[in-house]
Amino acid sequence: MNPLILTIILMTVFLGTMIVMASSHWLMIWIGFEMNLLAIIPILMKKYNPRAMEASTKYFLTQATASMLLMMAIIINLMHSGQWTITKVFNPTASIIMTLALAMKLGLTPFHFWVPEVTQGISLTSGLILLTWQKLAPMSILYQISPSINLNILLTMAVLSILVGGWGGLNQTQLRKIMAYSSIAHMGWMAAILVYNPTLTMLNMLIYIMMTLTMFMLFIHSSSTTTLSLSHTWNKAPLITTLILITLLSMGGLPPLSGFMPKWMIIQELTKNSSIILPTLMAIMALLNLYFYMRLTYSTSLTMFPSTNNMKMKWQFETKQITLLPPLIIASSLLLPLTPMLSILD
Amino acid sequence: MMTYIVFILSVIFVIGFVGFSSKPSPIYGGLVLIVSGGVGCGIIMNFGGSFLGLMVFLIYLGGMLVVFGYTTAMATEQYPEVWVSNATVMGVFLLGLLMEVMLVLYVLKSEEVGVVFKFSSVGHWAIYDIGNSGVFSEEIMGVAALYSYGAWVVVVTGWSLLVGVLVILEVTRGD
């Protein structure tokens, strides 16, 4: 793509999310979402194969539908409260429709069907932007309307998302689909704690973005999109193999890595609010996630996966430089001792 | 009938939308959009927005739909689909009509749901208001407010339109 056009389009994606996060007028928020959607379509369609076209079309259709639902909720809110500012949404109809619209944008169950298909059809870098940056805007709106969200709907969607994210990822060998299902599960964890303590949602979002960034950077470095090609990294760059191990275990939520911090805090907050069965179920379903991360580490770092002999002697091309990989690795594995610093997120 | 004119016009509006949502060939979709645009203009004018109704006719129908009509005329096929040519299209159209008829009956017969006659103004929430003077029309004041207090909205929408054109050019380039 022409560098000038690419700059303008990336700037508009950034501007769209910033407008959503910084606006106090509901119409500007809707405009920000639409601007974001419009500008990310050519980024998703960077490669001109039919798979990418189909993925971009699916993304556009689902996000446009969600924007329309959001607009309807905004207008119902306007009719009942007479004003356009972002506050607690007092009317229950508007609140429910808004929650459903934002869940569609995030990819929570039962609106999760587009996430694996869209993530699989696009390149790794586009998938990175899709799974990290695009989650910021809807989550910030959910944060702002969190006092008025219907608890039953949100918790149902959250628990089902954790289940679907874990269960659906079990049969996958394509790395982008694995990351998509992992994203669905993490969004479920974030949505579950939103009503009780929104600060933890922001913490989970932060840690999730850092871990997903790290994983995608490692995949881009080894140019691998399937489990099989990931299992050849011991030949290309053995250090990457170790880093994949650490980051995947962190994503699974194992202490003493930083992925444990959000899960621990969320379970603690939920039990403080006297719900015991729910966090138990959530923790058990996170094991499904851990299973397929472990399978990836088993085939990549812990064993030499069976391959043909010519794969065992790889020609060393010039190494790709990856942005910011060392800080990201540190952030996604060693942040657990900094847990008392949670108070800065308030 | 005049008290219900907004209701009748909005029913025709929705029927028009059902007409092109059932996906006949784009030429017929454009035809229905002309009808819907004209009817929408009528709805706006019934609330006192004569300037905005004129804008709909000039810019939307006279600019965008004309360009759309020319491009679809260039890309049309030999036997374009009408609403009655394909069982699926006709089925969807009839289903949409049926839903609309049921909704109209519900609105007219039920006691809870009523027909909107007049929007109440935003009261003292608006920062740019003419009060109850009755001399200036509210919508002209709204347009004026857009270019003074709402300059940021103009910047954002102008930028969105520019990026929209760039995105469309980029997507259709194909390479």
From Swiss-Prot, chain A:
It comes from the Eukaryota. Pfam families: NADH_dehy_S2_C (PF06444), Proton_antipo_M (PF00361). Its EC number is 7.1.1.2. It catalyses: a ubiquinone + NADH + 5 H(+)(in) = a ubiquinol + NAD(+) + 4 H(+)(out). The keyword Transmembrane helix applies. It is an enzyme of class 7 (translocase). It is found in: Mitochondrion inner membrane. The chain crosses the membrane at residues 3-23, 25-45, 59-79, 96-116, 122-142, 149-169, 178-198, 200-220, 237-257, 274-294, 322-342. The keyword Iron does not apply. GO terms for cellular component: mitochondrial inner membrane. GO terms for biological process: mitochondrial electron transport, NADH to ubiquinone; mitochondrial respiratory chain complex I assembly. One of its GO terms (molecular function) is NADH dehydrogenase (ubiquinone) activity. It is a multi-pass membrane protein. InterPro entries: Complex_I_Subunit_2, NADH_DH_su2_C, NADH_UbQ_OxRdtase_chain2, ND/Mrp_TM. Keywords: Electron transport, Membrane, Mitochondrion, Mitochondrion inner membrane, NAD, Respiratory chain, Translocase, Transmembrane, Transmembrane helix, Transport, Ubiquinone. Core subunit of the mitochondrial membrane respiratory chain NADH dehydrogenase (Complex I) which catalyzes electron transfer from NADH through the respiratory chain, using ubiquinone as an electron acceptor. Essential for the catalytic activity and assembly of complex I. Belongs to the complex I subunit 2 family. Core subunit of respiratory chain NADH dehydrogenase (Complex I) which is composed of 45 different subunits. Interacts with TMEM242. This is NADH-ubiquinone oxidoreductase chain 2. It comes from Equus asinus (Donkey). The gene is MT-ND2.
From Swiss-Prot, chain B:
It comes from the Eukaryota. It is an enzyme of class 7 (translocase). Keywords: Electron transport, Membrane, Mitochondrion, Mitochondrion inner membrane, NAD, Respiratory chain, Translocase, Transmembrane, Transmembrane helix, Transport, Ubiquinone. Gene3D superfamilies: NADH-ubiquinone/plastoquinone oxidoreductase chain 6, subunit NuoJ (1.20.120.1200). Its main location: mitochondrion. Its EC number is 7.1.1.2. GO terms for biological process: mitochondrial electron transport, NADH to ubiquinone; mitochondrial respiratory chain complex I assembly. It is a multi-pass membrane protein. It is found in: Mitochondrion inner membrane. The chain crosses the membrane at residues 1-21, 25-45, 47-67, 88-108, 149-169. GO terms for molecular function: NADH dehydrogenase (ubiquinone) activity. Belongs to the complex I subunit 6 family. Core subunit of respiratory chain NADH dehydrogenase (Complex I) which is composed of 45 different subunits. Core subunit of the mitochondrial membrane respiratory chain NADH dehydrogenase (Complex I) which catalyzes electron transfer from NADH through the respiratory chain, using ubiquinone as an electron acceptor. Essential for the catalytic activity and assembly of complex I. This is NADH-ubiquinone oxidoreductase chain 6. The lineage of its organism: Eukaryota, Metazoa, Chordata, Craniata, Vertebrata.
